[in-house]
Amino acid sequence: MKANDSLAAKFQEDTRIPYVLYQLAKSYYMAAEYTKACAYFDCGLYFDLNPRLEYVIDMVETYGYALLNSGQADHALFLENVYEEFGNTADFNFLMGLIYMNNEMFDAAVVEFKKALKMPEERARGVNSYLACYNIGVIYECLGQMTEAEQYYNRCGGYEPAEKRLENMKK
């Protein structure tokens, strides 16, 4: 047992291992093998990581998307546990909005999408503008709040799916 503890301690000290696990996970994610990606992201996040490193931020966010894409939206709720470290970006707020939306936690989803809208910068295009507005519109439409839905669809700046929703609402 002590040999295993010693090996685990060595792995914990080697800062290259989480990055290699991240690269493997990202490769599986890009190949749309989301379940395999999740396994490697999970292993990579086991390590004590610096949440300010760019690859760590990307690992957390991409893991969330991999969980959603592999039908594990309920498991993705664990990202609430790292909200304090990562919740200061439009990308993470948008991701949490999607996670809440997929778990039918619509009020929480709207709160997160609105937080994303207030953020000045984003890494993924649209998460702090038209995509957040679109998802808020979808939620309001599904809840029967058509006036609010229309307002948010109109804020999407010509985003085609929002335009189609507006057309359907007029029928």
What feature does the model see in each segment?
Residues 127-171:
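Terminal, low-structured helical/coil segments at or just beyond the last alpha-helical repeat
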Residues 8, 44-46, 84-85, 114-120, ...:
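Amphipathic alpha-helical segments of tetratricopeptide repeats
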Residues 15-21, 52-61, 87-95, 126-133:
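Generic helix N-cap/helix-start motif at coil->alpha-helix transitions
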Residues 3, 37, 75-76, 109, ...:
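Single-residue signature of alpha-solenoid repeat helices
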Residues 4, 41, 79-80, 113, ...:
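Hydrophobic/aromatic packing residues within the alpha-helices of TPR/SEL1-like helical repeat arrays
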